[in-house]
């Protein structure tokens, strides 16, 4: 007879606890890089759109992740991640 495999993996914390911890980490990181008024407006928009639901929590997590990714990719002054802006040589020596 076939049997379902036993769950031998590590104990995982519940999804809602993990999600709320992730949201708090993203919010604390976002406050370092964006004006508080922007973040407050974003939270207000999410609350008006989704109310106090898990969909709203997931939406704000997704938006904050995207904002932070783009912010770092463009080149945050506080981060080593991002596009390195190279100075162009005036004599054109760097052209190939």
UniProtKB/Swiss-Prot annotation:
According to its UniProt entry, one GO biological process term is: viral penetration into host nucleus
List the disulfide bonds in this chain.
none
What organism is the protein native to?
A: Human immunodeficiency virus type 1 group M subtype B (isolate OYI) (HIV-1)
Residues bearing PTM Phosphoserine: 79, 94, 96
Cellular location(s): Virion; Host nucleus; Host extracellular space
- Function, as annotated: During virus replication, may deplete host UNG protein, and incude G2-M cell cycle arrest. Acts by targeting specific host proteins for degradation by the 26S proteasome, through association with the cellular CUL4A-DDB1 E3 ligase complex by direct interaction with host VPRPB/DCAF-1. Cell cycle arrest reportedly occurs within hours of infection and is not blocked by antiviral agents, suggesting that it is initiated by the VPR carried into the virion. Additionally, VPR induces apoptosis in a cell cycle dependent manner suggesting that these two effects are mechanistically linked. During virus entry, plays a role in the transport of the viral pre-integration (PIC) complex to the host nucleus. This function is crucial for viral infection of non-dividing macrophages. May act directly at the nuclear pore complex, by binding nucleoporins phenylalanine-glycine (FG)-repeat regions.
Pfam families per UniProt: VPR
Region Homooligomerization: which residues?
1-42
Its main localization is: virion
Task: Summarize subunit and interaction data from the UniProt record for this chain.
Answer: Homooligomer, may form homodimer. Interacts with p6-gag region of the Pr55 Gag precursor protein through a (Leu-X-X)4 motif near the C-terminus of the P6gag protein. Interacts with host UNG. May interact with host RAD23A/HHR23A. Interacts with host VPRBP/DCAF1, leading to hijack the CUL4A-RBX1-DDB1-DCAF1/VPRBP complex, mediating ubiquitination of host proteins such as TERT and ZGPAT and arrest of the cell cycle in G2 phase.
Q: Note whether Transport occurs among the keywords.
A: yes
**Which protein family is it in?**
Belongs to the HIV-1 VPR protein family.
Keywords from UniProt, A to Z, are: Activator, AIDS, Apoptosis, Cell cycle, Host G2/M cell cycle arrest by virus, Host nucleus, Host-virus interaction, Ion channel, Ion transport, Modulation of host cell cycle by virus, Phosphoprotein, Transcription, Transcription regulation, Transport, Viral penetration into host nucleus, Virion, Virus entry into host cell
Note, other = HIV-1 lineages are divided in three main groups, M (for Major), O (for Outlier), and N (for New, or Non-M, Non-O). The vast majority of strains found worldwide belong to the group M. Group O seems to be endemic to and largely confined to Cameroon and neighboring countries in West Central Africa, where these viruses represent a small minority of HIV-1 strains. The group N is represented by a limited number of isolates from Cameroonian persons. The group M is further subdivided in 9 clades or subtypes (A to D, F to H, J and K).
| Stated name of the protein | Protein Vpr
* One annotated Gene Ontology cellular component of this protein: host cell nucleus
Modification(s) after translation: Phosphorylated on several residues by host. These phosphorylations regulate VPR activity for the nuclear import of the HIV-1 pre-integration complex.
